[in-house]
């Protein structure tokens, strides 16, 4: 695979339009109140296209008697050099995670750290593509209820390439 080269603002505009289309068509984002939050697979796709690979450097069990808790540290590597880093925690006390097994809590800590590392490194590209810069996996506690009418407007706006930050025209 040939890596994407970004040297000018026009390169970024073209690349962000391409990734917006791909991420939308492949449902690699979550809509929260009319704003698109990209899942870590979308962040990884864009990072990979730029030659950036996440490496989990540490996964630390910081649990206590009542809480399963993991902290993960991830580095982004490009051409053998560290170009970014993300640190994240997940616990089984979070909304929606009380039934998670230990491995799932550990896995989510890694997923969040990967998303955070990419957000720091390429969040500006995702913003140009019309998405929010917070990875979707960090938005677990947000109420994602959207009315059917508003969801239809959001989908139409994304399809037309005329999306706004709040999903309105």
Cite the ranges covered by each PLM segment.
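Polyanion-binding surfaces on beta-sheet-dominated domains and ring/shell assemblies
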Residues: 1-164
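Amphipathic, non-membrane alpha-helical rod segments
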Residues: 167-169
């Amino acid at each position: 695979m040939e890596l994407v080269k970004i040297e000018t603002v026009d390169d970024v505009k073209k690349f962000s339009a391409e990734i917006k289309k791909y991420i939308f068509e492949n449902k690699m984002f979550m809509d929260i109140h009319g704003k698109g939050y990209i899942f870590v697979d979308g962040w990884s796709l864009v990072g990979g296209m730029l030659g950036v690979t996440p490496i989990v450097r540490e996964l630390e069990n910081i649990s206590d008697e009542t809480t399963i808790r993991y902290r993960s540290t991830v580095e982004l590597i490009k051409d053998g050099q560290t170009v970014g880093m993300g640190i994240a925690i997940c616990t089984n006390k979070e909304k929606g995670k009380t039934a998670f097994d230990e491995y799932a809590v550990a896995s989510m800590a890694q997923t969040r750290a990967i998303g955070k590392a990419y957000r720091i490194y390429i969040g500006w590209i995702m913003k140009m593509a019309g998405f929010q810069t917070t990875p979707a996996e960090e938005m677990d506690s947000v109420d994602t209820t959207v009315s059917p009418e508003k969801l239809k407007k959001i989908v139409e706006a994304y399809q037309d390439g005329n999306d706004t930050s709040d999903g309105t025209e």
